[in-house]
Amino acid sequence: MCAKPNHLFVTVTFIFGFAVCIVQISAWTSIGKIAIKDGKCDPKNGKLYSIGEKWHNNEDCFEITCIQGNKGTVAQQVTSCPVHAMKTGCKLKFPKGEFPNCCPFYDCSKN
């Protein structure tokens, strides 16, 4: 008698593998609290941002968006650079500029 393949195991394995691939090519996003002033996001950089407005932290290469929080509050949604798997023989570069141009990348041109 032959054993039947465990379709649940195969499906879960496929989904996990697919998720790992997505993580390696996608930026991450997180949501957190931020100071509020006059109903706007106050990142303490001298400017106030309305819901939907974006600003950048080019030193750490983030894009931040002021979003509607819970119960009438505001929050910040932080988007960062994609995470890349290490590439053998390539050099990791850290360019300057505004997000997403400041995101690190692998330079494989000398291969």
UniProtKB/Swiss-Prot annotation:
It comes from the Eukaryota. Expressed by the venom gland. Contains 4 disulfide bonds. Residues 1-28 form the signal peptide. GO terms for cellular component: extracellular region. Pfam families: SVWC. Its main location: secreted. It is found in: Secreted. The keyword Glycosyltransferase does not apply. GO terms for molecular function: toxin activity. Keywords: Disulfide bond, Secreted, Signal, Toxin. The keyword Membrane does not apply. Belongs to the scoloptoxin-16 family. This is U-scoloptoxin(16)-Sm2a. It comes from Scolopendra morsitans.
